[in-house]
């Protein structure tokens, strides 16, 4: 069972240099929700690193290839119950961490919207337009070079992001930089060797657009990558035992731990260098 966090509340701060001339280049690339010209309540800070063309990458997810079709799938008879199933697995892990929260690889903003994540970034501008309409404050950037100041986020979410990342160690270094004391990383992924991951791995092997560069990990491999990057896994949940290709899907309950055959796994981890000195706010029993 996951217990609610007693992490220190993050103090509000200003978006650094928002009105300064130095920030004009990055302001031009920020995609704020419609009608919003300034960040509300200044929960978090942008730094003055402009997202220049050399820090941008080609679309690194299926959402970047065809954002409209990708987003519409979540409203389909298949997509709706699967989305609800995956969100139910992620929610208890991310809700224990303080605001503000950031999603790396936010895509069209489906998960951010449902999980209370206010900030997101993605290399696909097309996908970000959907996220912006959902009220997410977004930036056209990649997880290896995040335009936010350090130690300001209570949680960083990566849902279906790591399989498209070429350098996991780099993105984990940035995540550690971004997390405030007591904050945590929450990852949702398709474990290699399960029917759903195998389906997308086959598409990747065939060079299908949007999947060509995908790489999948087992839970053990991912946990080792996290450990090598200075994280400690503190909770695990799994769901989605229904295989691909069914005519109808039901919303599944999530279970603590990792079960054989589960098509979706959610993991939360904390930076070992910045854990609370007493008991940790997250516990798995």
UniProtKB/Swiss-Prot annotation:
Induction: A member of the dormancy regulon. Induced in response to reduced oxygen tension (hypoxia), low levels of nitric oxide (NO) and carbon monoxide (CO). It is hoped that this regulon will give insight into the latent, or dormant phase of infection. InterPro entries: Methyltransf_11, SAM-dependent_MTases_sf. Pfam families: Methyltransf_11. GO terms for molecular function: methyltransferase activity; S-adenosylmethionine-dependent methyltransferase activity. It comes from the Bacteria. CDD domains: AdoMet_MTases. Belongs to the methyltransferase superfamily. This is Uncharacterized protein Rv2003c. It comes from Mycobacterium tuberculosis (strain ATCC 25618 / H37Rv). The lineage of its organism: Bacteria, Bacillati, Actinomycetota, Actinomycetes, Mycobacteriales.
């Amino acid at each position: 069972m996951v217990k609610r966090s007693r992490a220190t509340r993050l103090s509000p701060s200003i978006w650094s240099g928002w009105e300064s001339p130095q920030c004009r280049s990055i302001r031009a690339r920020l995609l704020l929700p419609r009608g919003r010209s300034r960040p509300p309540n200044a929960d978090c800070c942008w730094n003055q690193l402009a997202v220049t063309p050399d820090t941008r990458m080609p679309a690194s997810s299926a959402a970047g290839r065809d954002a409209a079709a990708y987003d519409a799938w979540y409203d389909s008879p298949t997509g709706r119950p699967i989305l609800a199933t995956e969100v139910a697995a992620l929610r208890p892990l991310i809700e224990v961490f303080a605001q503000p929260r950031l999603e790396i690889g936010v895509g069209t903003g489906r998960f951010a919207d449902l999980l209370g994540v206010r900030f997101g970034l993605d290399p696909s501008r097309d996908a970000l337009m959907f996220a912006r309409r959902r009220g997410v404050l977004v930036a056209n950037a990649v997880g290896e070079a995040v335009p936010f100041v350090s130690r300001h986020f209570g949680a960083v979410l990566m849902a279906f992001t790591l399989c498209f990342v070429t350098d996991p160690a780099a993105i984990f270094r940035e995540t550690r930089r971004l997390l405030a004391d007591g904050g945590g990383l929450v990852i949702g992924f398709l474990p290699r060797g399960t029917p759903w991951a195998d389906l997308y791995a086959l598409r990747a092997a065939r060079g299908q657009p949007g999947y060509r560069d995908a790489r999948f990990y087992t839970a053990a491999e991912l946990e080792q990558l996290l450990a090598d990057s200075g994280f400690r896994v503190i909770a695990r949940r799994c769901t989605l035992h229904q295989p691909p290709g069914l005519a109808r899907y039901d919303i599944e309950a999530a279970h603590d731990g990792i079960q054989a055959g589960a098509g979706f796994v959610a993991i939360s981890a904390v930076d070992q260098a910045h854990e609370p000195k007493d008991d940790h706010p997250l516990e798995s029993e």
